[in-house]
Amino acid sequence: MKFNALAKKAAKGPAPLEHGGSVEVEDLIRFVLEHGSEGATEIERLCALYGWREEFQYNADGTHLAPMAPWAQVCAAFGHGGVAGLQPLLDDPRRATYAIGVLEDVRSEASVMALLGFCAQADFSQSDPMSAPSRALAALNSLLSFDKGVVVPVATQQSLLRLVQRAWEQAPTTQGRSLALYAARGASVAEAMAWLQSLALEEEEMVAARKVALKRLRQRL
């Protein structure tokens, strides 16, 4: 996207200009991935110019408008500092989920390592699937589980396996445990298969998740 194209989207509806106008989160991420530091500066300019909001706006009709300022901040941090620039935001509970969203779209070994580092300190005992730890594990699942995923060394795959094993143990819900099983698809193959096959599962959802994970791991042999 060109600079003037983003500026035009920010200057028109349908959303109020303080909520980004017609700018979508995906626009900001693509823009900063394409334009780097210069793109980050432009995002910061638009955020200041239109006073992009920090908080959700909830309307009487039950709809809501998402805040654009946090996305602008994390995109700008990445544009100026790369993956390392997002580290302070990962450490900020108010910004972590936004930083995780950008890291997922960066799709690099460095972004995988940043997510693993975040998860290493995370508590997976929360039941909320939108919590930062769950979002980070879901991002790793997206980045590492499929044919066109990020290629990482075996040591990283082993770190992922240790992570999903801990997430499995801590998760209080079937949904959380199933996510851990799905994420094992990107782990070191032989060890992940042995672990999955050792689990005594009864819930239909988790049995199905294990089946999917084992199928993918066999494809990677």
Where are these regions (language model features)?
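N-terminal leader/linker segments that initiate helical-solenoid repeat arrays
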Residues: 1-23
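Repeat-mediated protein-protein interaction surfaces in helical alpha-solenoids
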Residues: 6-10, 51-53, 80-85, 160-164
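Structural detector for internal amphipathic alpha-helices that build alpha-solenoid repeat scaffolds
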Residues: 15-37, 45, 56-78, 84-88, ...
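Amphipathic alpha-helical segments within extended alpha-helical solenoids and repeat-rich scaffolds
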Residues: 47-53, 115-122, 157-168
